[in-house]
A protein has these predicted regions:
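Predominantly the C-terminal beta-signal and adjacent terminal strand-loop region
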Residues: 140-214
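Gram-negative (and chloroplast) outer-membrane scaffold detector with strong preference
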Residues: 55-141, 145-154, 193, 198, ...
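Solvent-exposed loop/turn segments connecting transmembrane beta-strands
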Residues: 40-49, 107, 152, 191
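Outer-membrane beta-barrel translocator domains and adjoining extracellular loop/strand segments
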Residues: 40-46, 78-85, 123-131, 169-177, ...
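Serine/proline-rich low-complexity intrinsically disordered segments, especially terminal tails, linkers
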Residues: 6, 17-20, 46, 57, ...
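Non-catalytic effector/regulatory segments
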Residues: 25-34, 115, 156-158, 188
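Sec-dependent N-terminal signal peptides
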Residues: 3-14
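Short glycine/proline- and aromatic-enriched beta-strand/turn motifs that initiate or cap beta-hairpins
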Residues: 18-66, 200-214
Length: 214
C-alpha cells in the first residue's frame, strides 16, 4: 500500500506538465481494498479482500456529474474469530446511480466528490450455510477522488470511500445460529460499512484540446 501511495503521488508530479482535460463523458474502473468499520462484530469477524467498481458518467461544464455503475466487494470470514472455525465470506453486488462534482484545479490535478446510491444484493456463504444467505438492501457510498491526468483522454485516481451496505451483520448472517460469540445486541445495531482505498483509471471519451487547437 505504501508503494501504491508513492506511485500515485509520482503520477501527480508527472501530470503537472500534462495537458488539461475538459470532462465530458467518461468511463472509470477502480480496484481497491475495503476495511470493515462501524458494526463491531462485522469489523472483528470479517476481513475485506477486494472491491471493484466500473462506472460511466457524464459531466456538465459546471462540473456536476451524473453516472451509473456497478460495485462488487468480498469480505472473508476470519476463521480465528469464530467458534467453531468456519470458512466462507460475503459477496456484495450493487447497481448504483452516482451524483458528484468534478473539478480540475490545474492542468494535471483534479478532485471529484460525490455519492453513489444503489440496490444491493449480498450473498453469504459458509460451512454453516447449506446454500447461501441472501440480503437485499440500499447501498450508499460517499467518496472523494484525487485525480492525476496522464494525457488528454486519460487519468489515474486515488479514491477514498465509505460504503454503507445497508444490513445489520450478526453471526446468523454467516450461519452461526446458536451463539452471539460474546457480542451484545448493541454490537449488532449499526449498519455494516467499510472504509475503502481504491486506485482507478479513467478514460475521457471527449478529452480536451489545447486552447490554441480550438
Amino acid at each position: 500500500m505504501k508503494f501504491s501511495l508513492v506511485f500515485f503521488f509520482y503520477l501527480i508530479i508527472f501530470s503537472l506538465s500534462s495537458q488539461s482535460i475538459d470532462p465530458d463523458d467518461s468511463f472509470t474502473f477502480e480496484l481497491g481494498l475495503p476495511n470493515a468499520i462501524n458494526n463491531k462484530a462485522y469489523r472483528s469477524i470479517m476481513q475485506g479482500l477486494v472491491c471493484i467498481s466500473p462506472s460511466y458518467q457524464y459531466a456538465l461544464k459546471n462540473g456536476i456529474s451524473f453516472g451509473v455503475g456497478l460495485h462488487y466487494s468480498y469480505f472473508a470470514i476470519n476463521e480465528y474469530r469464530v467458534q467453531p472455525k468456519i470458512f466462507g465470506g460475503i459477496h456484495s453486488a450493487v447497481a448504483f446511480l452516482k451524483l458528484g462534482h468534478e473539478k480540475f484545479w490545474t492542468e494535471g490535478f483534479g478532485t471529484e466528490t460525490g455519492c453513489k446510491i444503489g440496490y444491493l444484493n449480498s450473498f453469504a456463504l459458509s460451512d454453516s450455510i447449506k446454500n447461501y444467505r441472501r440480503t437485499e438492501a440500499t447501498f450508499i457510498e460517499p467518496f472523494i477522488s484525487f485525480i492525476a491526468t496522464s494525457s488528454v483522454n486519460s487519468s489515474y485516481r486515488l479514491t477514498i470511500g465509505f460504503p454503507f451496505y445497508g444490513f445489520n451483520f450478526t453471526p446468523e448472517t454467516i450461519g452461526i445460529l446458536d451463539s452471539n460469540l460474546g457480542y451484545s445486541n448493541a454490537d449488532f445495531s449499526k449498519i455494516a460499512s467499510a472504509f475503502t482505498i481504491s486506485f482507478g483509471y479513467t478514460f475521457y471519451f471527449n478529452g480536451k484540446k489545447n486552447p490554441d487547437e480550438d
